[in-house]
Each structure stands twice: as C-alpha cells, then as structure tokens.
Amino acid sequence: MSFRFINPEALGAPRGYSNGVLTSGGRLLFIAGQVAWNREQEIVSDDLVAQFDRALENLIAVVTEAGGQPEQIARLILYVTDKDEYKQRMTEIGERYRARMGKHFPAMVLVEVAGLLEDRAKVEIEAVAVL
C-alpha cells in the first residue's frame, strides 16, 4: 500500500492537509465518527482541544486495532460545533495533531454543525484508512 499526495500547484500549498490522496493496494477501513469519550462512554472534558485530542486518540485506536498505523489514514472529516473557537485554537490543536499523527496530512475537511449526537461533544472525527 502506498500513498501519493496530490496537491496541484494551481491550488497553492495546503496547510495541514492534502488536496487529494491516491492509494494503491490495501484494504479500506471506514472509521465511524469518534468523540472524546472514555471506556464508559463519558465525554472526558468540555475543552475543545482536549476533546480533539481524545477523539483523535480514539480514532487511531480503531486503526491500530485493525492492524494499521496513523500514517495509513487517507481522509479525515472533522465536525465541530464552533468553527470560530476551532480557528482561534488551531495552534494548540495542531500541536496535539502532530503529537499523534506526525507530519502525515491526509485529505481533510472541517464542517461546522449545529450540534452532535453527544450533547457535550464539541468535535467528532471520522476517517478512511487504507491498510
């Protein structure tokens, strides 16, 4: 399995994501939206950065359980309840991201939503990995 990151010059240099990811070989793993909850399915914090970190940790746990590594994540979809807060805290969020994902930047989208199924959740992350 290999990834080729597609970033056309005409689109400018992306910051923290890739415009496209071309894969060859491997199996697809579709990862359900992950929120910042623990084993008892309780949200661990009301802080956005802490929630982002735990949701990403939970997502990576699914990839690992399937026999993969974070570098095999091809696409991330982030749902947030407050885009402005996310933008204000991007530096902190980026630090947590790099601590878990290194400099691996899959195709990514961020969507602001009115709410998530878990009332206290501020972020939910789903993904596709190629194993």
Residue ranges and their predicted role:
Residues 1-57, 61-74, 80-131:
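N-terminal presequence-like segments and the immediate start of the first folded domain
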